């Protein structure tokens, strides 16, 4: 049994992202995993970081991460990034010195040392764009940024990334195939 912490970032309970969340939770629970789901919109998470020290909410989210084996992030990609509420959550929660620290090399130069080693991350993202455009013209920018610029810096190197393209334009049959991928991912987490 694994403890899975889900961070969900979509405002619409009838969105395809909600279907991903619900499918993942149902499948993982049937497999015997323990789920802890954070719905950023329902909890009215304030994504604005103004240099303040971590408050109770951020400290609670960090504790929930510490108690988990797997972090699952579910959100759409809008304008080649996740919604501001998710980006702000990353900025506030997965921040130094808690999630990573810098080891000084020389002068003002250092490199990050992750503090979340041994954890796994699973990222589910939906796109309105077709896969060809994202891979060709935008060089998988959202994927690389999350994998390298967020999770790897925090010490999480086991990152599974599942992307679903052109979601507003695909058939219901194709969406069901997407949800089968979600089920398989939940079974193999």
List the predicted regions and their residue ranges.
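A short, flexible beta-alpha/helix-coil linker loop
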Residues: 11, 43, 127-132, 166-169
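Helix-loop-strand module that forms the ligand-binding subsite of alpha/beta enzymes
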Residues: 57-146
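N-terminal beta-loop-helix "entrance" segment that forms/cooperates
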Residues: 40-56, 175
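Residues at the starts of beta-strands that form the adenosine-phosphate
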Residues: 3, 29, 34-36, 119-121, ...
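A short beta-strand-loop structural module common to alpha/beta enzyme folds
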Residues: 33-44, 162-165
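N-terminal beta1-alpha1 ligand-phosphate binding loop
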Residues: 2-33
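Short hydrophobic segments within beta-strands
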Residues: 7-9, 38, 124-126
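Glycine-rich phosphate/pyrophosphate-binding loop and the adjoining helix
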Residues: 133-189
């Amino acid at each position: 049994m694994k403890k899975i912490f889900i961070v969900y970032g979509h405002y619409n309970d009838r969105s395809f992202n909600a279907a991903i969340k619900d499918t993942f939770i149902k499948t993982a629970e049937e497999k015997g995993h323990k789920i802890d789901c954070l719905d950023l919109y329902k909890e009215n998470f304030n994504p604005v970081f103004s240099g303040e020290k971590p408050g109770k909410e951020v400290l609670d989210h960090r504790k929930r991460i510490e108690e988990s084996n797997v972090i699952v992030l579910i959100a759409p990609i809008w304008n080649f990034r996740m919604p501001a509420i998710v980006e702000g959550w990353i900025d506030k929660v997965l921040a130094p010195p808690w999630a990573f620290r810098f080891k000084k090399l020389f002068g003002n130069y250092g490199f990050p040392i992750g503090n979340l080693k041994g954890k796994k991350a699973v990222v589910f993202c939906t796109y309105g764009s077709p896969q060809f455009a994202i891979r060709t013209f935008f060089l998988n920018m959202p994927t690389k940024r999350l994998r390298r610029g967020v999770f790897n810096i925090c010490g999480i190197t086991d990152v599974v990334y599942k992307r679903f393209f052109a979601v507003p334009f695909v058939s219901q049959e194709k969406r069901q195939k997407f949800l089968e991928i979600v089920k398989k991912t939940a079974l193999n987490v």
